[in-house]
A protein has these predicted regions:
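Active-site-adjacent structural elements that line small-molecule/cofactor binding pockets in enzymes
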Residues: 1-317
Length: 317
C-alpha cells in the first residue's frame, strides 16, 4: 500500500515574508512531501487588498529556504505569464532547489486581479481552458528538451523556442488543478503527472472515472497520474477548540466566517476525524492530501498531521 503523502499549501495572503518562510522551513523539517503556495496577486479570501506575495519569486525563496520537500504553485495562473517564460522560471527553480520543482498550472479564475493589472481574462472560462491546454502542451515539450513552434490560430506564437539549461529532473512533473469534465480533465489526462481537486470522496470518485475515460481516449496510463485532494485543515483535541482556532485564523485573514460557512473544503476537528476522512479519500484513490494553511500558519495542526494523522492512516491501510 502506498503511504499517505502530505503537502503543505501556505496561503500567500495576510503574511510577511519572514513568517511565510519560517513556516515553510518547519514543514520541510517535519517531513512534508511537498510545499506549495498560491499564484495570486490580490488576496482571494476576505478583503482583496491584504498583503500577498507573488508566486514565482516566492518559489525561488522556498528553493533556497528548504532542503527536501518538492515545491510548486497550487496552481500557477496560466493567464499571468507567457508559457515559455513559465517553463524558464520553473527550470531555474529546479536548479535552485536541486531538482525539487513541480510546475503547477491552471486556467485562472480570479477576475479582480486580472482587472486591476489589465491581464487578458479571455471571453470566459472555456477560452481560458483552451489556453491552458495549449500552454501545457508547449511547456511539457519544452521541459522535455524539444523545440516548440506554435500552430497558426492559437493563443501563443512560439517560434523555434527551446530551453537551455534543461531541468535537473529527467522528468519535471506537471500539476494541473481543477476538475472540469470536458476540458480540464482532458488536459490532465494528456499532460499532468499530478492532479489536484476539491470535493467529497463521492464527487472525486466520479471525477476520477471521467479522468480515466479521458486517459483511455488519449492513450495514457491513468496510474501515472498522482491524485491529490485539497483541504483547509485545523486539528485540536475537540472540534469546538479547532473551530475557535479557525475563527482566529479567518479573523487574521479578514474573512467573515459567514463567507466560509458552506465551504466543505474546510476540515475542522480532531486527529481521529482527519484519519477517517483521509481514509475515505484513499478508498477512491487519492493518496496525497494537500493541506491549505492560512497565515499565520497553525504549527499544532502542521505537527499533528505528520505525527498523528499520517501514521494513523498508514496503520489503518
Amino acid at each position: 500500500v502506498t503511504q499517505l503523502k502530505l503537502g503543505a499549501v501556505l496561503w500567500s495572503q495576510a503574511t510577511d515574508w519572514a513568517g511565510f518562510l519560517s513556516s515553510a522551513h518547519r514543514a520541510d523539517e517535519l517531513g512534508y512531501d511537498s510545499i506549495w503556495t498560491w499564484d495570486h496577486v490580490y488576496a482571494i479570501f476576505g478583503d482583496p487588498d491584504q498583503p500577498i506575495v507573488e508566486g514565482y519569486t516566492a518559489l525561488a525563496g522556498l528553493a533556497m529556504g528548504t532542503e527536501r520537500a518538492d515545491i510548486g504553485l497550487l496552481v500557477g495562473a496560466n493567464t499571468f505569464r507567457n508559457p515559455g517564460i513559465v517553463a524558464k522560471s520553473v527550470v531555474t527553480v529546479d536548479h535552485m532547489s536541486g531538482g525539487r520543482a513541480i510546475l503547477g498550472l491552471g486556467g485562472a479564475w480570479f477576475g479582480i486581479e486580472h482587472d486591476a493589472f489589465g491581464i487578458d481574462f479571455g471571453s470566459g472560462f472555456g477560452q481560458r481552458l483552451d489556453w491552458l491546454d495549449e500552454a501545457t502542451a508547449a511547456i511539457r515539450a519544452l521541459l522535455d528538451g524539444e523545440t516548440v513552434s506554435s500552430d497558426d490560430g492559437g493563443r501563443y506564437d512560439f517560434r523555434d523556442l527551446k530551453l537551455n539549461p534543461l531541468p535537473v529532473q529527467a522528468h519535471l512533473p506537471i500539476m494541473i488543478g481543477g476538475s472540469g469534465e470536458k476540458k480540464t480533465l482532458r488536459t490532465v489526462a494528456a499532460y499532468a503527472d499530478q492532479w489536484n481537486a476539491f470535493g467529497s470522496p463521492e464527487v472525486l470518485s466520479h471525477k476520477d472515472q471521467v479522468l480515466r475515460a479521458h486517459c483511455e481516449s488519449v492513450g495514457r496510463d491513468h496510474t501515472r497520474i498522482e491524485r491529490t485532494v485539497g483541504g483547509k485543515i485545523v486539528i485540536r483535541d475537540t472540534e469546538a477548540e479547532a473551530r475557535r482556532v479557525l475563527e482566529d485564523l479567518m479573523e487574521h485573514n479578514r474573512t467573515p466566517m459567514a463567507n466560509i460557512e458552506d465551504d466543505d473544503t474546510f476540515w475542522v476537528g480532531t486527529a481521529d476525524e482527519m484519519i477517517e476522512r483521509f481514509l475515505a479519500y484513499r478508498e477512491v484513490g487519492f493518496d496525497t492530501v494537500l493541506v491549505e494553511m492560512p497565515a499565520p500558519y497553525d504549527p499544532e495542526t502542521m505537527e499533528k498531521l505528520v505525527e498523528v494523522v499520517r501514521p494513523g492512516v498508514d496503520a489503518a491501510a
